[in-house]
Amino acid sequence: MVQRNILITGSNRGIGLELTKQFLTKGDQVFALCRKSSSDLVLIKPTRILEGVDVLDSNSIRDVSTKLLGTKIDILINNAGILIPDNLQSLEEENVFTQFLVNALGPLKMVKAFLPSLNTNAKLVFLTSRMGSVGDNNSGAYYGYRASKAALNAIAVSLALDLSPKGISVGIFHPGMVATQMTGGQGIPTIESARGLIERIESLNLNNSGKFFHQNGEELPW
């Protein structure tokens, strides 16, 4: 298998860390982007750790894209995200805006910054959530998070359409309910989620670009 250059945001813990680990095991080069590294990330020895990358900060995104000039990226995985639980009583405008900036605008800024570095037939991966599905909403609440992930889904579909002439495919993947800091440790193990996500990434092509999949292979409604 040809060694690939893979960029992963939010790689210092949770799903991002496990994806980094599993891609390294496959023999790929992984560039681990994060706000602050972790002992777990250092332990698995990514190709390169790039700290200080905050998707809220356009300058930090621009700086890291400059540092990696000349490196052709085969897979860009937008994993960094935030969840702030809310309901009608606890809803705060600032929290809604923050989730939009991190979960929707952040990944779009990453794509814009790294577009010149994407290899021929590169893959863009967006870790979204089925909570961003309108048709699958059966429980309500989580207004800011749901809206931000729905916005991310819309952005990713537009990117799939805009970038298909360049041979770039776009994956929109729900990782499942995963036991991470974001979910309070509830859900499936990160190793299981990452394994399924990698299967979806490996099978991603222009024919299924822009579709919404669960990591287990189920196609999800918008």
Language model features: what each stretch is:
Residues 8-9, 78-79, 123-129, 169-174:
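Structural signature of the Rossmann-like NAD(P)-dependent dehydrogenase/reductase core
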Residues 12-22:
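N-terminal Rossmann NAD(P)H-binding glycine-rich loop of SDR-like oxidoreductase domains
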Residues 26-41:
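Conserved glycine-rich Rossmann-like NAD(P)H-binding loop of the short-chain dehydrogenase/reductase
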Residues 45-59:
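Rossmann-fold cofactor-recognition segment
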Residues 82, 87-99, 120-164:
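Catalytic loop of short-chain dehydrogenase/reductase
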Residues 111-112, 157:
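A short, exposed helix-loop element centered on a Lys and neighboring polar residues
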Residues 172-175, 180, 184-222:
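C-terminal helical subdomain
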